[in-house]
């Protein structure tokens, strides 16, 4: 799969017990230091026993061929979908992904991204997740204002990593006296990287204050963009 070749699985339900190399090395080092784990065996199953006759590695993973194949397919598709599979700490998926990448050929290490460019600059999606949103990078040309919209449920965090800009936010609606809510101003710079949260129900923009340099902003959103349900409504911050 790392070489983009087809695989054949005759029985997806076949279960394997797999031991990751790092877990094996950790246990070997522990044994050398007198901290080994001991067991007895019932058939092929290790039963922990501090007085057991055998040393064993306690961390193994029971997975089916079908589960392995599905995970490998999701790893292979990541470069085209940008969706990072869930890889919790210590999980089989995390260990298998590291193993998969170690077999990746040189011509698959780098892959293209879609830059949505116009006269104002560009916007590029970098990475998506199923549970924790997506990461993008926005480039604004000198003097350009981007944004001027708000979201009902979506929220974002902006990180200016290069350039000098101004982020503005204003709560949608009016106060009890019928006045627009005040605009909040946050001056940002790549010389001092800070996190600015774009709140739900607040229209916001980002302005490149430089006359010569691009403004580069890394953006995290709590959900991946859905063209059918964009949850984006245009309203100027300074109306």
Where are these regions (language model features)?
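Double-stranded beta-helix
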Residues: 177-182, 207-239
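A short beta-loop-beta micro-motif enriched in histidine and acidic residues
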Residues: 132, 144-157, 190-192
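Mid/C-terminal beta-alpha module of Rossmann-like enzyme folds, strongest
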Residues: 23-26, 30-115
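A short glycine-rich, His/Asp/Glu-containing loop-to-beta-strand
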Residues: 109-148
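NAD(P)-dependent short-chain dehydrogenase/reductase
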Residues: 1-34, 68
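Short acidic-glycine-tyrosine-enriched beta hairpin
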Residues: 173-201
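Glycine- and acidic-residue-biased ligand/ion/polar-headgroup-sensing regions
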Residues: 153-175
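Short beta-strand His + acidic residue motifs that chelate non-heme Fe in jelly-roll/DSBH
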Residues: 147-149, 167-169, 195-198, 204-211
């Amino acid at each position: 799969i790392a070489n983009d070749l087809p695989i054949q699985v005759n029985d997806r339900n076949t279960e394997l017990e797999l031991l990751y190399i790092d877990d094996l090395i950790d246990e070997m080092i522990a044994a050398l230091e007198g901290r080994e784990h001991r067991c007895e065996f019932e058939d092929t199953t290790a039963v922990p026993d501090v007085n057991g006759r055998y040393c064993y590695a306690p961390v193994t993973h029971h997975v089916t061929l079908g589960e392995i194949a599905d995970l490998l397919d999701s790893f292979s598709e990541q470069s085209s979908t940008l969706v990072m599979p869930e890889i919790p700490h210590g999980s089989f998926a995390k260990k298998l992904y590291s193993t998969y990448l170690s077999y990746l050929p040189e011509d698959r290490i780098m892959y293209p991204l879609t830059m949505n460019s116009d006269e104002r600059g560009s916007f590029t999606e970098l990475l998506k997740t199923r549970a924790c949103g997506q990461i993008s990078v926005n480039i604004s040309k000198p003097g350009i204002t981007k944004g001027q919209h708000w979201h009902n449920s979506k929220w974002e965090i902006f990180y200016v990593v290069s350039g000098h800009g101004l982020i503005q936010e204003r709560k949608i609606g009016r106060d009890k006296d019928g006045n627009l809510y005040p605009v909040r101003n946050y001056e940002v710079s790549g010389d001092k990287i800070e996190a600015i949260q774009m709140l739900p129900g607040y229209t916001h923009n980002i302005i490149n204050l430089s006359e010569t340099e691009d403004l580069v902003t890394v953006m995290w959103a709590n959900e991946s963009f859905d063209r059918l349900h964009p949850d984006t409504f245009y309203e100027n911050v300074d109306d």
